[in-house]
Amino acid sequence: MNTIVIAPDSFKESMTALQAARAIEKGFRRVIPNANYRLIPMADGGEGTVQSIVDALQGERKVVKVEGPLGDTVEAEYGLSGDRKIAVIEMAQASGLHLVPKEKRNPLWTSTYGTGQLLIDALDEGVEQIILGIGGSATNDGGAGMAQAVGVRLLKENGEPIGKGGGKLKELARIDMSKVDPRIQQVKLQVACDVDNPLVGEKGAAVVYGPQKGATRATIRELDEQLLHFANIIEEELGKEVASIPGAGAAGGLGAGLIAFLDAKLIPGVELVLQATNFHELVKDADFVITGEGRIDQQTVYGKTPIGVAKAAKQYGVPVIAIAGSLGQGYEAVFEHGIDAAFSLVPRIMSLDEAMQQGDSLLEQAARNIAVVSSWNKST
């Protein structure tokens, strides 16, 4: 009996990863009804990661009230695996740019405090592992707010706590780790990070990502200086050099804070999802793998889900087929990275809106056509 692994990412604004996987399975079953199908919803650590892992691990989502980027109360969701041993958190749920109206965006004031509150809530659930995605932030506070929420005391020269936001880092003089929630050291904390920006400098958090968060040129200079001060105090107080670590600048320096205060590991997002879903164990005896996402082009080779899936499958010599909403310029580059064939699900000229509305039926039909060809190979 054929074993077919179906491991797509979401098709943004059209299908979740699980919906896409089910559409592919439905198409294949029209041709190969008795195969052993293994559906593994995937993600790359960014948007949709919580949903994919929750779906793959038969888990659930939990809604909690936390402090938003500007200090107001927001509702944030995170995922728990079915056995409640793994929590999957997207920092954007608590500290994301979408939570701040455009006219109020200013990373001098926004804080990651709510992200730390999500970490504490996960600890209250008794989890053994936390996967944290750190894209889409509204912040540039170096993870200071997150640290304060889990018990790190960031102090001024006079012993009072510093304020919240990227504009308060210059106040930092001392760091007291004695009140950190001890449970944080008992869990495996892994951070999904797909950028290699350092904390400061021309490729740092403020210069590269500050403008999209509402920072002016003057604000960017100030933020960069404050992050450098923050890094210097961390090195003096904790003996950790974080200013130049690749990924430290992710999410406005949250990467640096997670490394400095919580000894977190920064790992490419798709690798984390592969681990969490037990992908390697499920793929090693497969006949072939079907993956895909909304668009495949020359950028797909830079850490996107189909490439992560393909590289993992190729460790076991398993062929990989990708289906995309569209095949963009340079998509052939994926053939050098483990994908054996790539197909578009669009069978004729149609608008983007039409294709997205019909995504599941188009994906099912494309999968059916691929299944026909694969069955020819088995019968010859």
UniProtKB/Swiss-Prot annotation:
What does the entry give for GO biological process? organic acid phosphorylation
Q: Name one GO molecular function term.
A: ATP binding
- UniProt-listed InterPro entries: Glyc_kinase_flavodox-like_fold, Glycerate_kinase, Glycerate_kinase_RE-like, Glycerate_kinase_sf
Q: Which domain of life is it from?
A: Bacteria
Keyword entries, A-Z: ATP-binding, Kinase, Nucleotide-binding, Transferase
* A Pfam match: Gly_kinase
- The SS bond pairs are none
Kinase: is it a keyword of this entry? yes
* Catalytic activity, as annotated: (R)-glycerate + ATP = (2R)-3-phosphoglycerate + ADP + H(+)
Q: Does the record carry Lipoprotein as a key word?
A: no
| Listed EC numbers | 2.7.1.31
**Family, as annotated:** Belongs to the glycerate kinase type-1 family.
PANTHER family found in the cross-reference section: GLYCERATE KINASE (PTHR21599:SF0)
Protein name, as recorded: Glycerate kinase
Tell me what organism the protein belongs to: Halalkalibacterium halodurans (strain ATCC BAA-125 / DSM 18197 / FERM 7344 / JCM 9153 / C-125)
Q: Lineage of this protein's species?
A: Bacteria, Bacillati, Bacillota, Bacilli, Bacillales
GN (gene name):
glxK
